[in-house]
Amino acid sequence: MQTKQDGRLGTEKIGKLMLELALPSVLAQIVNVLYNIVDRIYIGRIPDVGSLALTGVGVTFPIITIISSFAGFASGGGAPLAAIALGQKNRERAERILGSSTSLLLFFSVLLMAFFFVFQTPLLYLFGASDNTIGYASTYISIYLVGTVFVELAVGLNTFISCQGHARTAMCSVLIGAVVNIGLDPVFIFVLHMGVSGAALATVLSQALSAAWVLRFLTSKKSGIRLSPRTMKPDFAILGSVMALGISPFIMSATESAITIVMNHGLQTYGGDLYVGSMTILQSVLQLIFVPVNGFTNGVQPIISYNFGAGQFDRVRQTIRRMIAITFTAAFVYVVFAMLRPALFAGLFTTDPKLIAIVVKVLPVYIAGMAIFGLQSGVQSSFLGLGQAKISLFIALLRKVILLIPLALILPHFFGVMGVYYAEPIADVCSVVTAVTLFLCNIRKILSKEALAKVTHTEA
C-alpha cells in the first residue's frame, strides 16, 4: 500500500518538494545547533571559571560525537534503504528495516553507556583534558551518559520520519528538544547554580522528550511505516545492508572524534589549555553552517532515494543538481563572512582577551578550505541516497583518516601549534576535488536499472 504522503515524492514538482521537505529540516537543525552553541556560550560565561569549564566540556565532544555516530550508523543506512523500498512500493520491507534498525540502536545504547562509564577518565585525558579541566569534563559526561538511549533513539529514528516525507514532524522532534534545552540551560546553570552539571542535565531531559516524540509518531497510525515488536526482531540480512551503507556516515561522524583527539593533543602539547579552548570555538563556528547544510541534504535525500527506487532517474538528476548548487553557495557565503569577521564569532563564546586573540588569528586559516566544502556535502549525500556504500565510505575515509589525521600529526613538527590548524584546509581542498571527480565519473553508471537492481538485491 502506498500512502499519499510518500507517493508525492515521485510526482510533485522537485522545487516544491525540496522546499517543503528541506526547509523544516534546515530550521530544525538551525535550532538544534543554536542550542548546542547557546550551551557553550552559557558555560563560557560561568563566573571565574568560564574558560576552563568551556575547555573541559570541549574535551567531552569526542565521546558525544561517537554516541551520535552510532545513531547515524543505523539511521544513515536504514533510512535511505527504507525510502528506496517505499519507492518500490514494498512497505513490508521498509518496516523490517525500521524495526531492525531500532533494535540495533538499543544494542548500541547499552554498549556505549557501559564502555564510557568504565573508561571515561583515561579517555578524557587522552582527548586533551588537563588537571585543570578534568573535573568539568568528568562532571558533564557522567550526567550525559545517563541519557545515551535517548540520544540514540531521538537521533537515530528521526530520519525514518523524514524519509517518509513527514518533514514537519521530524522538525518538531528536534525543536522540542532544542527549545527545552535552551530554556533549562540558564535556569540550571545560573539560577540553581548547578554550573556544568546543569548544562548536562538540561541536555539529557531535552533528548528524552525528543525520543518520546519520535517513538510516539512511529508507533502511531500517522506513520506510513510503523514500529512494532514484530518488526523489531533483528533481521541479520537487513542489518548487514543497513550497516554496509551506514558505515559511511558513521565514519564521517565518528572520525570527528579521532580528529578532535589528535588536534586537542597537538594543541595541548604545543599551545596549552587556551588553544584547546580555541578548537571548541572553531568547531562551533563550523557547526553554525554545516549542521544546517546537513539538515538540507537530509531533507532532500528522501526525494533522491524514492525516485531512484522508482526508476525515475531524470527526477534524481534534477534534485541532485539543485541540491549541490544550494549547498555550495550557502557554505561559500558563510565561510567567507566568518573569515572576514573572526572577532565577532570569538566574542560570542568568551570574554577572555587571550582566547579571543587566538581565535582571531587561527579562524581564517582553519576554515578556509570549507569555502568549497558544500560541494562535497552535496556529493556525499547523493551517493548515500543512491545506496552507494563503497564510494561514500571511501570519501569519508579520504578526508579524515587518510588526509586530516596524518597532517595534524605531522605538520606541528614543522610549524608548531599552527600546523594543527593548517591541516584542516589542506585536507578539505584535496577531499573536495576527489569527491567531485568521483561523482562526475560515476553518476551516469549509477543512475541505471542495473545499478538499482544491485542495491535492492543486496538488501533483499
Protein language model features and the residues they cover:
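Short alpha-helical transmembrane segments in multi-pass integral membrane proteins
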Residues: 1-22, 82-149, 191-247, 304-369, ...
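Hydrophobic transmembrane alpha-helices of multi-pass small-molecule transporters
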Residues: 66, 181-185, 211-215, 287-291, ...
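Helix-terminus/linker motif at the lipid-water interface of multi-pass membrane proteins
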Residues: 30, 34-55, 124-131, 187-194, ...
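Transmembrane helical elements of multi-pass membrane transporters/channels
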Residues: 20-39, 143, 177, 206-210, ...
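Small-residue-rich hydrophobic transmembrane alpha-helices
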Residues: 54-114, 151-170, 278-342, 373-392
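Residue-level signal for short hydrophobic patches within transmembrane helices
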Residues: 15-34, 38, 63-70, 146, ...
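Residue-level signal for transmembrane alpha-helical positions in Major Facilitator Superfamily
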Residues: 19, 34-35, 74, 115-119, ...
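Short runs within selected transmembrane alpha-helices of multi-pass transporters and secretion channels
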Residues: 75, 144-162, 170-178, 199-212, ...
